[in-house]
């Protein structure tokens, strides 16, 4: 049996981490956007061996347990202890790991949905397990519930699926421009001194967005958040200022990754692509993904 799940890449615009000793009560407030590109997870289940084996691969390359703690945590919970056979989980990412696109959550949620589909379970239980794995292993706090929401989402009550509450912004004709330049460790940022500034500025941004719930306002608030928290490094700030010259809405920093994102329409996208090409910078453009994640039997 081969099961496939697709989870959209998720970019956080601004956030407030909310920690709690119970994983499902931990989460984040904030806002973000889901992309039409993301993580594809294939789960192959074959019976007939004398033992229970679980294997994980990223982009076609097998990985050790310590390199895929979150995925193995999910798989160990969902593959029955008395199952005799081979379970292979293959994760393919459209964006690099560690760049702020919610890959760890995408892998966790995709694995949870695929294995729940195969062995029995529900959407909510699968999503809660993925969130639990993310929180326990410090992969992230709000990506799973954000990916479930689709579109341009706003996290208005913290917590995992079934506890946290999300809303969505209306939008028209926007695509997402991304400029992925490098890695940034969520674990290091959330353990650092910058957390207090994030909490203060993130709550301000959320309050302002709820007063004027529009994508354009979200981008202004996201840029302010990135600058006032000190998260936006000089290199990204310079690129953002150049993009400002050709975009109607400000670009902002991908939270948390060394990169930028912007909401663009077709005419602006062409100008931005030309600018970034002239600057010899990588970029990509994706649609906004408005559905929930997908899962089902794969027939190729």
Swiss-Prot record:
Disruption phenotype: Only viable in the presence of CoA or 4'-phosphopantothenate. InterPro entries: GHMP_kinase_N_dom, GHMP_kinase_PoK-type, PoK, Ribosomal_Su5_D2-typ_SF. Changing residue 28 to A: Does not affect kinetics toward ATP but decreases affinity for pantoate. One of its GO terms (molecular function) is ATP binding. Its EC number is 2.7.1.169. GO terms for biological process: coenzyme A biosynthetic process. It is an enzyme of class 2 (transferase). Keywords: ATP-binding, Coenzyme A biosynthesis, Kinase, Nucleotide-binding, Transferase. Optimum temperature is 80 degrees Celsius. It holds the Pfam family GHMP_kinases_N. Optimum pH is 7.5. The keyword Transferase applies. It comes from the Archaea. Homodimer. Phosphorylates (R)-pantoate to form (R)-4-phosphopantoate in the CoA biosynthesis pathway. Displays broad nucleotide specificity and utilizes ATP, GTP, UTP, and CTP with comparable catalytic efficiencies. Belongs to the GHMP kinase family. PoK subfamily. This is Pantoate kinase. It comes from Thermococcus kodakarensis (strain ATCC BAA-918 / JCM 12380 / KOD1) (Pyrococcus kodakaraensis (strain KOD1)).
């Amino acid at each position: 049996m081969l099961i496939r799940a697709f989870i959209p890449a998720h970019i956080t615009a601004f956030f407030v981490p909310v920690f709690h000793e119970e994983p499902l009560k931990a989460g984040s407030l904030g806002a973000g956007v889901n992309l039409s590109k993301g993580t594809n997870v294939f789960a192959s289940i074959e019976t007939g061996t004398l033992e229970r084996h679980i294997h994980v691969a990223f982009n076609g390359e097998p990985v050790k347990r310590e390199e895929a703690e979150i995925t193995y945590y999910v798989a160990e919970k969902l593959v029955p202890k008395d199952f005799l056979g081979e379970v292979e989980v293959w994760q393919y990412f459209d964006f690099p790991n560690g760049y702020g696109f919610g890959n760890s959550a995408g892998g966790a949620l995709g694995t949870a949905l695929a294995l729940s589909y195969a062995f029995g379970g529900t959407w909510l239980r699968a999503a809660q397990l993925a969130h639990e794995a993310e929180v326990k292993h410090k992969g992230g706090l709000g990506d799973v519930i954000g990916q479930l929401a689709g579109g341009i989402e706003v996290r208005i009550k913290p917590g995992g699926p079934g506890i946290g509450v999300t809303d969505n912004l209306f939008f028209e004709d926007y695509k997402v421009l991304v400029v992925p330049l490098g890695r940034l460790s969520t674990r290091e940022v959330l353990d650092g001194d910058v957390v207090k500034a994030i909490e203060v500025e993130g709550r301000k941004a959320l309050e302002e967005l709820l007063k004027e719930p529009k994508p354009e306002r979200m981008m202004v608030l996201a840029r302010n958040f990135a600058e006032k928290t000190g998260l936006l490094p000089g290199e990204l700030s310079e690129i953002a200022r150049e993009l400002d010259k050709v975009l109607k809405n400000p670009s902002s920093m991908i939270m948390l990754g060394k990169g930028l994102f912007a909401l663009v329409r077709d005419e602006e996208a062409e100008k931005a692509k030309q600018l970034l090409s002239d600057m010899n910078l990588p970029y990509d453009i994706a649609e906004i993904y408005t559905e929930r994640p997908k899962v089902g039997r794969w027939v190729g």
